[in-house]
From Swiss-Prot:
<dbReference type="GO" id="GO:0042330">
    <property type="term" value="P:taxis"/>
</dbReference>
<dbReference type="Pfam" id="PF01671">
    <property type="entry name" value="ASFV_360"/>
</dbReference>
<protein>
    <recommendedName>
        <fullName>Protein MGF 360-3L</fullName>
    </recommendedName>
</protein>
<comment type="function">
    <text>Plays a role in virus cell tropism, and may be required for efficient virus replication in macrophages.</text>
</comment>
<dbReference type="InterPro" id="IPR002595">
    <property type="entry name" value="ASFV_MGF360"/>
</dbReference>
<comment type="similarity">
    <text>Belongs to the asfivirus MGF 360 family.</text>
</comment>
<feature type="repeat" description="ANK">
    <location>
        <begin position="60"/>
        <end position="92"/>
    </location>
</feature>
<keyword id="KW-0040">ANK repeat</keyword>
Amino acid sequence: MQPSTLQALTKRVLATQHVSNDDYCILERCGLWWHDAPITLYTDGEQILIKTPYYKEGIKLNTALVLAVKENNYDLIVLFTEWGANINYALLSVNKEYTRNLCRNLGAKEGLEASEVLRFFFETKRHKTSSNIILCHELFSNNPFLQNVNMVELRMIIYWELKDLITNLIVNENSFTEMLTKYWYGIAVKYNLKEAIQYFCQEYEHLNEWRLICALSFNNVFELHEICNTMNIDMNINKMMRLACMRDNNFLTIYYCFALGADINRAMYGSVSNFRIENMFFCMDLGADAFEESLELAERHGYSVIVDILSLKIYKANPILLAKETNPEKINTLLKNYYPKNMLAYDIYRIDNYL
């Protein structure tokens, strides 16, 4: 959408240009100023993003509008609308009657459909940066509009984004605010958004265990290492290993728990129980030898593939993994693109005997 006036077009062009510090006064006079800093506009594919030193990674134009409305910043409400922001989304954060009247004059309707609220939620959260995830938390976690949407749909969005977590606690939270706070915190850990993680860590100390669960579940060994070395962890190492093993190919956090002394046979047994075949092979690489118990478990569950695997007597530990390294950089280097040695042995056996 093109700006509706020549003045708006001029401002849009100016916002895309590099301006020296000496000329910031021009941007301020033109209204290209927010949070005591200049506004920069740029495009990423088909979407328009607004950047400021505070939002240095950029936020979407519609998101910037909602924030400007929340702050009752009339000049920016008008400017962002002229640049193409959907004025109807302003209803998500309007908190003053005169701001509401301004939005009406700019074409906002009287209310939003639940589907529109969900669409904005879905579109906004897709931008995975620290500043945007923090902003999403501030805009949505206590937003009464979001509480009026279809909770089943919202919980499904949350579930699929964090489906690798081993717990359904987040989608069963009684508190709407707590559910969304955990959601944004989980996103920050999943995508290793350092500034966002630090924000949630400082603001929500009671969610330290949730941070640990997310680090284990999302294979974030760097975050796990920091937690284990800076916080008092009230969780048994074998429970930590069980959480890490619930998602397949979680080699980094499984190895870290192994290095801290977790029972690798118990980890193998748990991997079999949850049909995590790659984790099972990796546990064998780490020296697990609970073959008989795991075979019996696989037979009880009817896991014919695992029964076939464990019926062979060809597996042994991989010596290069037994040093129990806890440096996350070294672990990441060691296991980057790692293919379990025992899985390779099984693949070769099948090729030799079935092809």
